[in-house]
Amino acid sequence: AEWKERIEQKLGAMPEVFALHDSDFGRTDKVKHQIMLSDQTPFKHRPRPIRPQDLDAVRRHLQELSEAGVIQESESPFSSPIVVVRKKNGDVRLCIDYRKLNLQTIKDAYALPNLEETFSALTGSKWFSVLDLKSGYYQIEVEEADKPKTAFVCPLGFWEFNRMPQGITNAPSTFQRLMEKCMGDINLKEVFVFLDDLIIFSETFEEHETRLL
């Protein structure tokens, strides 16, 4: 269709907004994630064993994250264990067990939007586009002084995050606050933001094309 070709052509003229490869995470300079503790006492967990059949995949994943600048080697007094989960496609996902860190973290009062109430903003709209940020959390840097608190240990090394990891208290609040700040006055008027998902909505196609591009 003509409109589809026109939109694809316009999107092709702005390659900087798209990830070029799996490790192309991008980075924002508008915020850094802070981890404020009510109890500053460091803690250390022993590394949990990794199944032999998962070792190579975990090693590759750690190397990819390190090369992308998401993690770096650590000498932190804090240490959380990892849990290795296999995705449906066979890739590994590293889940850090941050329960101890989260217990010591002062909770951010910034609330996520109520989905039922927010969806009412979409009433009357007929055109929708959904955008998903590529590894959204990894686009936010961790405050330098707080990086050691994110440290995790496994049989393949001791690492800490340069970018905001999943599983830590307040990460959703940090992300939602950033997204709403970036959208400014168009939030809930032209776009609905929930963490790393954006829904652009409008009543007519002409209006939608303008909002999308």
Model regions and ranges:
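Retroelement reverse transcriptase polymerase core
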Residues: A1-L213
